[in-house]
Protein backbone atom coordinates (compact mmCIF):
# COMPACT_ATOMS: atom_id res chain seq x y z
CA UNK A 1 0.00 0.00 0.00
CA UNK A 2 2.84 2.42 0.88
CA UNK A 3 4.46 1.69 -2.48
CA UNK A 4 1.25 2.48 -4.35
CA UNK A 5 0.86 5.80 -2.48
CA UNK A 6 4.46 6.69 -3.30
CA UNK A 7 3.95 6.00 -7.01
CA UNK A 8 0.74 8.05 -6.99
CA UNK A 9 2.51 10.99 -5.33
CA UNK A 10 5.28 10.91 -7.94
CA UNK A 11 2.75 10.90 -10.80
CA UNK A 12 0.87 13.84 -9.25
CA UNK A 13 4.09 15.83 -8.90
CA UNK A 14 4.97 15.18 -12.55
CA UNK A 15 1.53 16.42 -13.67
CA UNK A 16 1.91 19.62 -11.65
CA UNK A 17 5.33 20.33 -13.12
CA UNK A 18 4.13 19.73 -16.70
CA UNK A 19 1.01 21.89 -16.39
CA UNK A 20 1.28 25.48 -17.84
CA UNK A 21 1.57 28.21 -15.26
CA UNK A 22 -1.10 30.96 -15.58
CA UNK A 23 -0.52 34.08 -13.51
CA UNK A 24 -1.58 37.70 -13.50
CA UNK A 25 1.73 38.52 -15.14
CA UNK A 26 0.60 37.37 -18.57
CA UNK A 27 2.19 39.08 -21.52
CA UNK A 28 0.52 42.51 -22.01
CA UNK A 29 -1.49 43.18 -25.16
CA UNK A 30 -0.96 46.62 -26.62
CA UNK A 31 -4.26 48.36 -27.48
CA UNK A 32 -3.83 51.52 -29.49
CA UNK A 33 -6.83 53.86 -29.74
CA UNK A 34 -7.73 54.98 -33.22
CA UNK A 35 -6.51 58.49 -33.87
CA UNK A 36 -9.35 61.02 -33.94
CA UNK A 37 -9.70 62.79 -37.28
CA UNK A 38 -8.94 66.49 -36.92
CA UNK A 39 -11.43 68.88 -38.49
CA UNK A 40 -10.14 72.22 -39.75
CA UNK A 41 -12.52 75.14 -40.29
CA UNK A 42 -11.66 77.60 -43.06
CA UNK A 43 -13.33 80.81 -44.21
CA UNK A 44 -13.19 81.44 -47.96
CA UNK A 45 -14.87 84.54 -49.44
CA UNK A 46 -17.25 84.81 -46.51
CA UNK A 47 -18.21 81.11 -46.53
CA UNK A 48 -17.14 78.52 -43.99
CA UNK A 49 -15.83 75.08 -44.98
CA UNK A 50 -14.53 72.12 -42.98
CA UNK A 51 -11.65 69.88 -44.04
CA UNK A 52 -10.57 66.45 -42.83
CA UNK A 53 -7.38 64.92 -44.22
CA UNK A 54 -7.42 67.60 -46.89
CA UNK A 55 -10.95 66.84 -48.11
CA UNK A 56 -14.11 68.92 -47.70
CA UNK A 57 -16.74 67.69 -45.26
CA UNK A 58 -20.09 67.47 -47.10
CA UNK A 59 -23.66 66.70 -45.97
CA UNK A 60 -22.53 66.23 -42.38
CA UNK A 61 -22.71 67.73 -38.91
CA UNK A 62 -19.50 68.64 -37.15
CA UNK A 63 -18.70 70.06 -33.71
CA UNK A 64 -15.70 72.35 -34.05
CA UNK A 65 -13.78 74.32 -31.45
CA UNK A 66 -13.54 78.00 -32.32
CA UNK A 67 -11.46 79.94 -29.83
CA UNK A 68 -12.38 78.60 -26.40
CA UNK A 69 -15.86 77.36 -27.35
CA UNK A 70 -17.26 74.48 -29.39
CA UNK A 71 -20.00 75.02 -31.97
CA UNK A 72 -22.17 72.79 -34.12
CA UNK A 73 -22.03 73.28 -37.90
CA UNK A 74 -23.75 71.62 -40.83
CA UNK A 75 -22.03 71.48 -44.21
CA UNK A 76 -24.10 71.10 -47.39
CA UNK A 77 -23.38 68.98 -50.48
CA UNK A 78 -20.81 71.53 -51.67
CA UNK A 79 -19.14 71.68 -48.27
CA UNK A 80 -20.51 75.11 -47.35
CA UNK A 81 -21.70 75.70 -43.80
CA UNK A 82 -25.29 76.85 -43.45
CA UNK A 83 -25.05 80.47 -42.28
CA UNK A 84 -27.23 83.58 -42.17
CA UNK A 85 -26.58 86.61 -44.35
CA UNK A 86 -25.11 89.15 -41.95
CA UNK A 87 -26.06 92.14 -44.12
CA UNK A 88 -29.71 91.07 -44.15
CA UNK A 89 -30.06 89.36 -40.75
CA UNK A 90 -27.51 91.09 -38.54
CA UNK A 91 -25.34 89.31 -35.97
CA UNK A 92 -28.19 87.54 -34.17
CA UNK A 93 -30.58 86.68 -37.01
CA UNK A 94 -30.60 83.08 -38.22
CA UNK A 95 -31.05 81.09 -41.40
CA UNK A 96 -33.56 78.28 -40.85
CA UNK A 97 -32.78 75.04 -42.70
CA UNK A 98 -34.38 71.59 -42.83
CA UNK A 99 -31.99 68.70 -42.17
CA UNK A 100 -33.27 65.13 -42.19
CA UNK A 101 -36.84 66.16 -41.40
CA UNK A 102 -36.02 68.68 -38.65
CA UNK A 103 -35.47 72.43 -38.71
CA UNK A 104 -32.41 74.18 -37.26
CA UNK A 105 -31.18 77.76 -37.09
CA UNK A 106 -27.69 79.00 -37.99
CA UNK A 107 -26.19 82.44 -37.37
CA UNK A 108 -23.92 84.43 -39.68
CA UNK A 109 -20.87 82.48 -38.49
CA UNK A 110 -22.49 79.12 -39.18
CA UNK A 111 -23.10 78.28 -35.53
CA UNK A 112 -26.21 76.25 -34.74
CA UNK A 113 -28.32 78.23 -32.26
CA UNK A 114 -30.65 77.50 -29.35
CA UNK A 115 -33.49 79.45 -27.75
CA UNK A 116 -35.50 82.32 -29.24
CA UNK A 117 -34.24 83.95 -32.42
CA UNK A 118 -35.44 86.10 -35.26
CA UNK A 119 -34.87 84.39 -38.58
CA UNK A 120 -36.06 83.29 -41.99
CA UNK A 121 -35.68 80.45 -44.47
CA UNK A 122 -33.70 82.63 -46.89
CA UNK A 123 -31.90 85.96 -46.90
CA UNK A 124 -34.78 87.62 -48.73
CA UNK A 125 -37.89 86.13 -47.08
CA UNK A 126 -39.75 87.91 -44.28
CA UNK A 127 -38.18 87.25 -40.86
CA UNK A 128 -40.18 85.81 -38.00
CA UNK A 129 -39.67 84.43 -34.51
CA UNK A 130 -38.37 80.88 -34.07
CA UNK A 131 -37.68 78.92 -30.90
CA UNK A 132 -35.06 76.14 -30.89
CA UNK A 133 -34.82 73.60 -28.05
CA UNK A 134 -31.75 72.50 -26.08
CA UNK A 135 -30.67 70.30 -29.01
CA UNK A 136 -31.10 73.10 -31.53
CA UNK A 137 -34.27 71.64 -33.04
CA UNK A 138 -37.16 73.96 -33.98
CA UNK A 139 -39.90 73.84 -31.33
CA UNK A 140 -43.22 74.56 -33.04
CA UNK A 141 -45.28 74.83 -29.84
CA UNK A 142 -43.06 77.44 -28.20
CA UNK A 143 -42.61 79.28 -31.48
CA UNK A 144 -46.38 79.70 -31.84
CA UNK A 145 -46.61 80.88 -28.22
CA UNK A 146 -44.02 83.63 -28.80
CA UNK A 147 -45.49 84.66 -32.14
CA UNK A 148 -48.99 85.01 -30.72
CA UNK A 149 -47.72 87.14 -27.84
CA UNK A 150 -45.71 89.31 -30.26
CA UNK A 151 -48.54 90.24 -32.63
CA UNK A 152 -48.73 93.92 -33.56
CA UNK A 153 -51.32 95.92 -31.56
CA UNK A 154 -51.49 93.30 -28.80
CA UNK A 155 -50.89 94.15 -25.15
CA UNK A 156 -47.14 93.97 -24.56
CA UNK A 157 -47.45 92.48 -21.06
CA UNK A 158 -47.42 88.85 -22.25
CA UNK A 159 -44.44 89.06 -24.60
CA UNK A 160 -42.48 91.04 -21.99
CA UNK A 161 -43.18 88.32 -19.45
CA UNK A 162 -42.00 85.61 -21.85
CA UNK A 163 -38.82 87.48 -22.78
CA UNK A 164 -37.85 88.14 -19.17
CA UNK A 165 -35.26 90.67 -18.05
CA UNK A 166 -34.11 93.06 -20.76
CA UNK A 167 -30.52 94.29 -21.16
CA UNK A 168 -31.40 97.92 -21.85
CA UNK A 169 -34.31 100.16 -22.81
CA UNK A 170 -34.56 103.37 -24.82
CA UNK A 171 -37.45 105.84 -25.09
CA UNK A 172 -37.89 108.20 -28.04
CA UNK A 173 -40.03 111.30 -28.32
CA UNK A 174 -43.49 111.44 -29.84
CA UNK A 175 -44.60 108.31 -31.66
CA UNK A 176 -46.25 107.94 -35.06
CA UNK A 177 -47.87 104.69 -33.94
CA UNK A 178 -51.63 104.63 -33.37
CA UNK A 179 -52.97 108.07 -32.50
CA UNK A 180 -49.45 109.30 -31.82
CA UNK A 181 -50.30 110.26 -28.25
CA UNK A 182 -47.34 108.51 -26.67
CA UNK A 183 -43.73 107.40 -27.08
CA UNK A 184 -41.85 104.61 -28.85
CA UNK A 185 -39.97 102.32 -26.47
CA UNK A 186 -37.40 99.69 -27.46
CA UNK A 187 -36.49 96.84 -25.09
CA UNK A 188 -33.23 95.11 -25.99
CA UNK A 189 -32.57 91.46 -25.07
CA UNK A 190 -29.66 89.14 -25.91
CA UNK A 191 -30.90 88.31 -29.40
CA UNK A 192 -34.25 90.10 -29.70
CA UNK A 193 -35.55 93.68 -29.82
CA UNK A 194 -39.10 94.49 -28.70
CA UNK A 195 -40.58 97.79 -29.90
CA UNK A 196 -43.71 99.03 -28.13
CA UNK A 197 -45.96 102.08 -28.03
CA UNK A 198 -46.28 103.63 -24.58
CA UNK A 199 -49.36 105.88 -24.22
CA UNK A 200 -49.05 109.06 -22.21
CA UNK A 201 -50.97 109.76 -19.03
CA UNK A 202 -52.71 107.17 -16.88
CA UNK A 203 -52.48 104.47 -19.59
CA UNK A 204 -48.67 104.59 -19.71
CA UNK A 205 -48.37 101.08 -18.27
CA UNK A 206 -50.56 99.59 -21.02
CA UNK A 207 -47.85 99.29 -23.66
CA UNK A 208 -48.80 98.01 -27.11
CA UNK A 209 -46.60 95.81 -29.31
CA UNK A 210 -45.29 97.51 -32.45
CA UNK A 211 -42.84 94.81 -33.55
CA UNK A 212 -40.45 92.09 -32.39
CA UNK A 213 -37.33 91.36 -34.41
CA UNK A 214 -33.79 90.03 -34.21
CA UNK A 215 -31.27 92.30 -32.57
CA UNK A 216 -29.02 94.03 -35.08
Ranges and model annotations:
Residues 5-216:
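Extracellular adhesion/carbohydrate-binding repeat motifs centered on closely spaced tryptophans
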